[in-house]
Curated annotation (Swiss-Prot):
GO molecular function, one term: hydroperoxide reductase activity
Protein name per UniProt: Alkyl hydroperoxide reductase AhpD
An annotated GO BP: cell redox homeostasis
Pfam families for the chain: CMD
Length: 194
């Protein structure tokens, strides 16, 4: 399903999210197309709703290079890992963890092949979705040091929050039932007692 058709299925209780999508994505004036659509793709991937991600990636292919689409998905992947690790360090009462080596590969942070500031913005947005304050502060600091404006940062966070909200709506509205291709446990439906 294309993105517009998917957005047309947004129920009345989530109308604000559909309107926000129009305002922060369709009517965006703060971010470049790559900054915007990379943020949209990265946040959709981090929000983990397959229906929304598929529709967004399909539309993004007309706005981003294939490399940028992959880099945005890569930002969601590597930052989701980092967000868990660094959020643990930040929240743990035992501060010794902050002095210990991460021991996790993070090469993609330097090998994504897109503008480093754009990638940094996507990393910040994914960190907001995943709720890692330590990562939010680190990525915001890099952007501000490179004279990236707070208005642009907040524009990306508006996108992140809207995409996450839409993912929640589509999760809530997706029909439930057996997973396609998964074996069905017929014993669960048996009326015979053992």
């Amino acid at each position: 399903m294309n993105l517009e058709a998917l957005l047309d299925t947004v129920p009345a209780y989530a109308r604000d999210l559909k309107l926000n999508f129009s305002a922060v994505v369709r009517q965006n004036t703060e971010l470049t197309e790559q900054q915007l659509w990379g943020t949209v793709v990265a946040c959709a991937a981090a929000s983990r709703n397959r229906t929304l991600l598929d529709a967004i990636v399909e539309e993004a292919k007309g706005k981003l290079s294939a490399q940028a689409v992959e880099a945005a998905k890569g930002a969601a992947a590597i930052l989701s890992m980092n967000n868990i690790f660094y959020r643990f360090q930040h929240l743990a009462v035992n501060k010794k963890y902050e002095t210990m080596r991460a021991g996790l590969r993070m090469n993609f942070l330097r090998q994504h092949g897109v503008d480093p500031l754009d990638f940094e913005l996507w990393a910040l947005a994914v960190s907001a979705v995943n709720g890692c304050g330590k990562c939010i502060d680190a990525h915001e600091r890099v952007l501000l040091q490179k004279e990236f404006s707070e208005e642009k940062i907040l524009a990306a966070i508006r996108v992140a929050s809207t995409i996450y909200g839409l993912a929640v709506v589509f999760d809530a509205e997706e029909p439930k039932g057996d997973l396609v291709g998964a074996p069905v446990n017929t014993d669960a439906y048996s009326t015979t007692t053992i």
